[in-house]
């Protein structure tokens, strides 16, 4: 199934809301399927940087909050958590928002 395009200005607005609420910086969009814990076809996968104070609960909260704002499932991968091939590949393939 093809994922419909999302309005980039609305996406940026919602990302700014999440970044103001949680200690996280969204770098951009990853190709669908990059986040292993989100399986829905219409999900959006993001690469993010961890800011001081972010814990697992905050990361989960950011995912849920952004998902609620966008009306579709969201997965967030932290750049600091990448290892091996993904640590090299994801920063190169991320699409800025």
Language-model features: where?
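Catalytic core of pol beta-like nucleotidyltransferases
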Residues: 1-31, 35-40, 50-97
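Short glycine-rich His-centered loop
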Residues: 44-45
């Amino acid at each position: 199934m093809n994922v419909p395009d999302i309005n980039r200005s609305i996406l940026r607005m919602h990302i700014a809301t999440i970044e103001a609420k949680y200690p996280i910086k969204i770098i951009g969009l990853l190709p669908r399927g990059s986040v292993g814990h989100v399986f829905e076809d219409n999900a959006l996968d993001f690469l993010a940087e961890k800011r001081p104070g972010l814990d697992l609960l905050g990361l989960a909260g950011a995912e849920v909050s952004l998902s609620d704002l966008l009306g579709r499932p969201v997965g967030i991968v932290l750049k600091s958590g990448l290892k091996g091939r993904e640590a090299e590949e994801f920063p190169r393939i991320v699409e800025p928002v």
